[in-house]
From Swiss-Prot:
The gene is pyrD. It is an enzyme of class 1 (oxidoreductase). Pathway: Pyrimidine metabolism; UMP biosynthesis via de novo pathway; orotate from (S)-dihydroorotate (quinone route): step 1/1. Signal peptide: none annotated. This is Dihydroorotate dehydrogenase (quinone). It comes from Myxococcus xanthus (strain DK1622). The lineage of its organism: Bacteria, Pseudomonadati, Myxococcota, Myxococcia, Myxococcales.
Length: 363
């Protein structure tokens, strides 16, 4: 069914199709009964062994939605109806901003990929907070992904993140510092150890005041060198973060394509292995002590399974959802359960980081 819908949507520009899809999910969310029914159907193939706990949050299964799809918390209920164990909104900034000029979103179907240079387009933290206050149904964790406004000087970026914490942290279940988007000039410099430590320290300090105990995650780029990943992990642990989200989009172009010259972040299948490499490195650096939410190139249960084995505790999707449609979660879960059983794992937590364990070691 979605194949036909996708064919029609793919006749439109990528951004117009996105707006139509979000509008549909928004209107779906107006019917609580329908949302609950659809979610129940999507989770039929999710046995209890698929549940996992990260930073004190319970995920019904390890397949969650990444930030970027619902920037303004307009379709949270409709997205939960699709079966996601968690939904992450944003990236949100203190003040509304239009983002970069269009066209700014491009499909590359033959590579199962997207290129975007959206530029943190959003209605601002205050408006998103108002929507979250009206929410009455939350069957799983809701994450709030925050960033800085484009016109905020880098040396004042901390103020923007703290302002977002004030507005949004009490309303979400976890907070994500996005310091890795390639579409806000200079933003990735915040991943450098000294600046990152200052930023995370300030955010943690404010969180302790406005939302004590709220888990804080950091979203990082797939383009970091192995040594840079080590530095980020060390800073994250020093600042007592709940975990990392690995990874954002890449500026690399590992193929020839007419659209490859377009500026922006590449997501989808080409990011799968670079993201997995960052997950492995981060897991090894922390000895498995720092939880990781893996994202990048997830389309199938096998993709989810590989990220879990590499060290992720939860796996997020975005581009895969665009290509696979609203039935994606329901299609993945039964096969994921089969993969776990095939390899002798009774629970998701048993397979996390499994590829790093020596043969014969206990699960």
């Amino acid at each position: 069914m979605y194949g036909l819908t996708r064919s029609l949507l793919f006749q439109l520009s990528a951004e117009r199709a996105h707006r139509l899809g979000m509008a549909g999910l928004h209107y779906l969310g107006r019917s609580r009964d329908l949302c609950e029914s659809l979610r129940e159907k999507a989770l039929e193939g999710a046995p209890p062994g698929l549940a996992v706990e990260v930073a004190g949050l319970r995920f019904a299964h390890p397949v969650a939605l990444a930030a970027g799809l619902d920037k303004d918390a307009e379709a949270v209920d409709g997205l939960f109806a699709c079966g996601f164990s968690a939904v992450e909104i944003g990236t949100l900034t203190p003040r509304p901003q239009p983002g970069n000029p269009s066209p700014r979103l491009f499909r590359l179907p033959e590579h199962r990929a997207l290129i975007n240079r959206m530029g943190f387009n959003n209605h601002g933290a205050t408006q998103a907070a108002a929507r979250l206050r009206m929410q009455t149904w939350r069957p799983g964790p809701l994450g709030v992904n925050i960033g800085k406004n484009k016109d905020t000087p880098l040396e004042q970026a901390v103020d923007d993140y703290v302002a977002c914490v004030d507005a949004l942290a009490p309303l979400g279940d976890y907070v994500v510092v996005n310091a890795s988007s390639p579409n806000t000039p200079g933003l990735r410099k915040l991943q450098e150890p000294e600046q990152l430590g200052q930023l995370l320290g300030a955010v943690q300090e404010r969180l302790a005041t406005v939302a004590p105990g709220k888990p804080l995650f950091l979203k990082i780029a797939p383009d970091l060198s192995p040594e840079a990943v080590d530095e980020v992990v060390d800073v994250a642990r020093a600042q007592k973060l709940a975990g990392l989200i690995a990874t954002n989009t890449t500026v690399a172009r590992p193929f020839e394509h007419p659209l490859a010259k377009e500026a922006g972040g590449l997501s989808g299948a080409p990011v799968r292995e670079p993201a997995n490499a960052v997950i492995r490195r981060a897991w090894l650096r922390s000895g498995g002590a720092l939880p990781i939410i893996g994202v990048g190139g997830v389309f199938t249960a096998q993709d989810v399974y590989e990220k879990l084995r590499a060290g992720a505790s939860v796996v997020q999707v975005y581009t895969g959802f665009i290509y696979e449609g609203p039935g994606m979660v329901g299609n993945i879960l039964p096969t994921l359960a089969t993969l776990l059983a095939r390899d002798g794992y009774k629970q998701v937590r048993d397979v996390i980081g499994a590829e790093h364990r020596k043969p014969g070691a206990p699960n």
